[in-house]
A protein has these predicted regions:
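Positively charged n-region of N-terminal signal peptides that target proteins for export
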Residues: 1-5
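Compact soluble domain cores
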Residues: 302-306
Length: 396
């Protein structure tokens, strides 16, 4: 078992180093085929060529990140797990599905790491989420290598975990701690077993590390570059491009996409308001059988749009009932609708008239600026991707 630990330490050290390297990697046909089999389980229609293109595009993305936003390579979010943690989960699943490796090993005693040990060792969770040097040094002195089969101390182990998990560990969740230890241990064992099997298949384990990292970081890097949208992630590339959009570009975009700036400018409407839902339902039935205007006369109800002479425009839209008329389908009687004040209304909206925002309107400027910046970001991305292919000699 000691020999296995030394082997894993050596191999993982090489792969950890590969996480920060930005040199070009040529994937073998065996490696592409291996990943094709893996992707097929989630996307049955994917082709070999599509897999090859994805793997190289991911490699291109990693190099873009290394140049422009290197922090994302280590961790996508300050509160999330490290990239290394995600890579290990990705590879463990890959080994399980493609190699059928059983990572069982001799039982390891974890009784030492109980709730009291965690609380005593870690202390209270820091309010700002950042560890002070004294605690870091203390954790660095606790060696987990005998348990995990790779050279790692407690700080390195905990630093890879998410903020939520770390918080629970500081509160003494020993079962969670042991669970994470076992995950790490099982990965390292599976890793040591996978390497010779993969080597016989013509697959470099370091290449799989890069492939895993590329797949994991792909959405975040593309979002950073402005060609993909990811929640809670801003794109400095888009922000810069948006500032460069000028009036002539906005005008040209407006002329080419005028139809998307069409809006409902005016409607005609009649309606009645009731304190009781039952009365509103009765009125709705009457309006269905006659017409809403006739129902107003028969019931003696005042038209809630009388103050506007039943002709409504966007200037009146601050009123809730006016907004309702604009959102009601043309030539239809609405359902019985509860108002914010707790009353009930029934409305009829008709003769909808449309107009176009002017090129100078704030809505046009905002939407056009966003769209133009995205177009430019996509073009930049495509140009850089093609340059990278030409530079590396990749043929897709």
């Amino acid at each position: 078992m000691k020999k296995m630990a030394i082997l894993v330490i050596t191999l993982l050290g090489a792969c950890y180093h590969s996480l920060v390297m930005a040199s070009f990697t040529q994937y073998s046909s065996d490696e592409v085929n291996f990943m094709h089999r893996a992707y097929l389980k989630h996307k049955p229609e994917i082709t070999i060529n599509e897999v090859k293109a994805r793997l190289y595009e991911n490699q291109f993305l990693l190099q873009q990140a290394a140049l422009k936003t290197p922090a994302i390579i280590k961790r996508q979010s300050a509160v999330g797990f490290s990239t290394q943690y995600h890579v290990e989960r990705y590879l463990k699943n890959l080994f399980d599905s493609q190699l059928a490796i059983k990572a069982q090993s001799s039982l390891v005693k974890l009784d030492t790491y109980d709730s009291q040990w965690l609380k005593r060792t870690l202390g209270p969770y820091p309010k700002n989420g950042q560890y002070v040097q004294s605690l870091i040094k203390k954790m660095q002195q606790i060696d987990l290598t005998p348990i995990l089969y790779n050279s790692i101390n407690l700080y390195e182990f905990i630093d890879a975990l998410s903020m939520q998990v770390r918080f629970k560990l500081h509160r003494g969740d020993s079962e969670l701690f042991k669970s994470e230890l076992i995950k790490k241990r099982q990965f390292n064992i599976a890793f040591s077993k996978a390497k010779p099997i993969l080597a016989k298949q013509g697959i470099d384990i370091e290449h799989l590390y890069e492939i895993a990292k590329g797949d994991i970081l792909r959405p975040s890097i593309q979002s950073w570059l402005g060609i993909n949208t990811m929640m809670h992630m801003q794109s400095p590339v888009l922000e810069k491009l948006e500032k460069q959009v000028n009036k002539s570009e906005i005008k040209a975009f407006y002329q080419a996409n005028k139809s998307q700036f069409k809006f409902l400018s005016q409607v005609k409407a009649h309606g009645a308001q009731f304190a009781s839902r039952a009365n509103a339902v009765d009125f709705h039935t009457l309006a269905d059988n006659k017409s809403l205007e006739q129902a107003l006369v028969i019931s003696g109800k005042q038209d809630i749009y009388a103050q506007y002479n039943s002709e409504l425009n966007r200037k009146n839209k601050s009123s809730w009932v006016v907004q309702l008329a604009f959102t009601t389908k043309e030539n239809t009687i609405s359902a019985v609708i509860r108002t914010p004040s707790g009353e009930w209304v029934v409305v009829h909206s008709y003769e909808h008239q449309f107009d176009y925002f002017s090129p100078e309107d704030e809505t046009v400027r905002y939407q056009a600026t966003k769209a133009i910046a995205k177009q430019k970001a996509a073009q930049q991305y495509e140009n850089n991707w093609l340059k990278w292919q030409n530079k590396t000699g990749v043929i897709l």
